Amino acid sequence: MPLSHFSDLLTVSQLNIRVRDILEKNIGQIWLMAEISNFSQPSSGHWYFTLKDERTQVRCTMFRNNNRHIFFKVQNGLQVLVRACVSLYEPRGEYQLIVESMEPAGEGILRQKFEQLKKKLAAEGLFAEKYKKPLPDSVKQLGVITSISGAALFDILKVLQHRDPSLPVVIYPTKVQGEYAPSQIVKALSIANRRAECDLVILARGGGSLEDLSCFNDERVARAIFDSDLPIVSAIGHETDVSIADLVADLRASTPSAAAERVTRDRRDIIQKLGSHQQRMAMAMDYYFSKLRQRFVHLSHCIEQQHPQLELERQKMQLIHFKISMEKIIQAKLKGLIHQEAHLKKNVLRRAPQIQIYQYQKQIQEEFHQLKAAMERKIHHYVQRFAVVSSRLETVSPLATLARGYSVTCFSSGSMLKKIEQVQIGDELNTRLQGGWIKSQVLEIKKN
């Protein structure tokens, strides 16, 4: 049969490529637990080995950029948990695993459980930022959940002693490793929330293996942290260790020491802020008293301008000016009349009409008396008006009040004394009476 009749004829290379694509797409990434054998580590840095169980085996490759993250000794006979992709080595047509990560079998199981729980809780929203509680700006009392014999507590207290030695600390002791640790941590969280005596809680432990830290990857602990009414700061292991508790907590600190630094204030900052507040208060008080002094001067000036004595003086000056004006008018009128009389006498003497002279004299005398009486009435009217105004002003004058036997008492600062509650023993007082001032000191206070 001619080759042209085989439209789908493949080469070996094409076949291997198709098989590789099928393996990678249909199977993809897997988790596998097996024993290492035939382990080799050539100069290229890549690892080549076989994973086997009691009956079968599969070839594996782990490239250098992945195996450089492995920090345990890999050797034949070691049980491991690997994450790998199924593929095909085309030159030989052999299927193989491309290993991406590897852990000893014990830790591998824990890691697998960690990933499963992480995926579950993430789907429920326990890691969501919207549920994170904000930390208080100022911590008045700090709670710490940890082992009382662990290094984590020592590190936290050391930082507090340096930064804020006056901060009260409540320790909720618990196991942080082992079978009973999760239940004790949950109980400690419950006690802290029930007492509600702290502003926030640090959940802390020193570094360790994945198995050592497994209690912080427990679902019960994660849900207790999520349900806490108090903000929780996690400080578990080293910076590279990330636990489920870290993901659920309201804030993750890389170490217990870092957690203590994050939630406390440096006493040097506190002293600096207090100094700044004191300076601002002093400036505010200076400004306030300056305004009070300005207002006092202004009010004193207004009182002086409105004092009844000044009004009396103004009225008096008006009467004096009026009197002078009236005297000038009268003198001018009299001068005119005298001049007129002299002129008339001259005419009379020249003509000698005795009867007419007598009539003119009589008319002049009558007009003089009328003018004089009018002037006296006018002066009397203004004198009476002045007396009325003076009487009214005297009625409202503080001096008149003093004349009736009353007095006015004020502090040495000038402020008026109105109530007995203003006075304290030892205060110096100034009392205004009719005719002068009395300066006194308070020796005894009696209330009605």
From Swiss-Prot:
Main location: cytoplasm
Alphabetical UniProt keywords: Cytoplasm, Exonuclease, Hydrolase, Nuclease
GO molecular function, a single term: nucleic acid binding
Subcellular location: Cytoplasm
EC number: 3.1.11.6
Cross-referenced InterPro entries: Exonuc_VII_L, Exonuc_VII_lsu_C, OB-fold_nuc-bd_dom
Enzyme class: hydrolase
GO cellular component: cytoplasm; exodeoxyribonuclease VII complex
Xref: Pfam families: Exonuc_VII_L, tRNA_anti_2
GO biological process: DNA catabolic process
Catalytic activity: Exonucleolytic cleavage in either 5'- to 3'- or 3'- to 5'-direction to yield nucleoside 5'-phosphates
Nuclease keyword on record: yes
Biological role: Bidirectionally degrades single-stranded DNA into large acid-insoluble oligonucleotides, which are then degraded further into small acid-soluble oligonucleotides.
Subunit structure: Heterooligomer composed of large and small subunits.
Family: Belongs to the XseA family.
Protein name: Exodeoxyribonuclease 7 large subunit
